[in-house]
From Swiss-Prot:
It is found in: Nucleus. GO terms for biological process: RNA processing. Keywords: Nucleus, RNA-binding, Transcription, Transcription regulation. The lineage of its organism: Eukaryota, Viridiplantae, Streptophyta, Embryophyta, Tracheophyta. The gene is LARP6C. This is La-related protein 6C. Transcriptional regulator. CDD domains: LARP_6, RRM_La_like_plant. PANTHER family: LA-RELATED PROTEIN 7, LUPUS LA PROTEIN-RELATED. Residues 1-29, 348-396, 414-455 are annotated as: Disordered. It comes from Arabidopsis thaliana (Mouse-ear cress).
Length: 455
């Protein structure tokens, strides 16, 4: 036993010497090493299974099953989504359809409609402007919904209906006062927000001032705008023309608020030259003008009295009551006034003998035509090419009329025709805006009475 220990010590000493000859650093390490012969026997422990490393999911794989609009991201090619087995689906959409979570239904495209929703598709890259515009115009966000509701409610206000005859015509056509959503969506302000009519209909359902039909194709006001309401509004609304250079809402409110409280202001711009909008949209003028609504008619009358700039008749501010200058009422009154003037001013003659018209014979007409008197003034190309006979001329009853440039008309009976004394067939002369006859003195020249001797 002692001999075996001695041999082991010798072997260790030999090994130590061999290591000392290898180098300084190795010798230092060998000097620090001590062999412990009394150490217990080493017994290896039982091997423990190391945890399996987590395998990251393959890029492009999603669970639950994600589908693009028009294709499946898994590329199963089932035909329902239209992926065609490409592995990435259709890349034409920037939104992903998220279906149900049943793994057995992934390749059958069976999804729960209640749990379906859309998320953004990062795999599809669009330009920033196109991506933002498409997402904003095809999705009904809260901001977009509020803008649509605010704009359409403004279009249905009393002042807008008064200034915009197009919407009023649509309201009058429908027995319930509905306006097509397609027309509302075609306006410039709404088209700038969205071109989707369905989104406009969905947004308007949240309005408390508007009612959308069940099919979502028509919209109307909750309270109808009657003719009585229109007349009352016109009575307390004034029209302002020749507006100042700064015709902003704040500046106009400051100007017209001097006489009383201003409820609403609408600035009406002139129509564009190539615009297809009806002329009824601009009631009063083809220039820029403003409609100012006051609380009552007293304040409106006061505004007309105080705010008119009569010193500058060309470019000064013009303020008028809307009720007094409605085009329809002016046209109606003018027609009635013209009828009264025709019946009162034009005399009727029962026989041709009492008529003061000039009677010229055929020979006199020939002589006058040769002398360039009446015929010369009348017959310079007038009536040529129309198949008219140069021998039949008359004014008043059953003939035709012509003037000689001095505001005087010659009455010549038609040859071979029966004379009739109906005043309705007389040609109307020019009229002034108030309905009175114009150019009664022949543009400032004294009237000349013609007789057969002068001819």
């Amino acid at each position: 036993m002692a001999q075996m220990q001695r041999e082991e010590v010798e072997s260790v000493t030999t090994e130590k010497k061999r290591l000392d000859g290898g180098g300084g650093s190795s010798g230092a390490q060998a000097t620090a090493f001590k062999f412990n012969a009394q150490a217990p026997e080493f017994v290896p422990r039982s091997h423990t299974t190391a945890p399996a490393p987590q395998v990251s999911p393959v890029s492009g794989y999603f669970y639950p099953c994600f589908h693009y609009n028009g294709g499946c991201i898994g590329g199963c090619g089932g035909g329902v989504c239209g992926g065609g087995g490409t592995g990435v689906g259709t890349q034409s959409s920037d939104w992903i359809y998220v279906g149900g979570g049943d793994p057995t239904a992934q390749h059958q495209h069976v999804h729960d409609p209640a749990a379906a929703f859309y998320i953004s598709n990062p795999a599809v890259q669009f330009p920033a402007s196109q991506n933002s515009s498409s997402s904003s115009k095809n999705l009904l966000s809260d901001d977009l919904r509020l803008k649509i509701v605010k704009q359409v409610e403004y279009q249905f206000t009393d002042m807008s209906l008064l200034a915009n005859e197009s919407i009023s015509k649509h309201i009058s056509k429908d027995p319930e006062g509905y306006v097509p959503v397609s027309y509302i969506a075609s306006t410039k302000k709404i088209k700038a927000l969205t071109s989707n009519h369905h989104l406009v209909s969905l947004a308007l359902r949240s309005s408390s001032k508007l009612v959308v039909s069940e099919d979502g194709k028509k919209v109307k006001r909750t309270s109808q705008f009657t003719d009585r309401d229109r007349e009352e509004l016109q009575g307390r609304t004034v029209v302002a023309e020749n507006l100042p250079d700064d015709h902003s809402y704040q500046n106009l409110e400051k100007i017209f608020g001097v006489v009383g409280n201003v409820k609403a202001i609408r600035i009406c711009h002139p129509p564009e030259s190539n615009s297809s909008r009806p002329k009824g949209d601009f009631l009063m003028s083809n220039k820029i003008h403003a409609l100012i609504e006051y609380d009552n008619t007293v304040i409106a009358d006061k505004a007309v009295e105080k705010l008119n700039d009569e010193r500058n008749w060309r470019k000064g501010l013009r303020v008028r009551l809307l009720l007094r200058c409605s085009p329809k009422s002016v046209l109606k009154n003018r027609r009635n006034f013209d009828g009264i003037l025709i019946d009162d001013e034009l005399p009727s003659y029962e026989s041709g003998e009492d008529s003061p018209r000039l009677h010229l014979t055929e020979s006199q007409l020939d002589n006058d035509g040769d002398d360039n008197n009446v015929g010369g003034l009348w017959g310079k190309g007038r009536g040529k090419g129309r198949g008219r006979s140069p021998r039949s001329y008359a004014v008043g009853g059953g003939g035709r009329s012509f003037g000689i440039g001095l505001g005087v008309s010659l009455g010549i009976p038609s040859l071979g025709s029966h004379e009739s004394s109906s005043p309705k067939t007389a040609t109307k002369g020019p009229r002034m805006p108030d309905g009175t006859r114009g150019f009664t003195m022949g543009r400032g020249k004294p009237s000349i009475s013609l007789s057969p001797n002068n001819l």
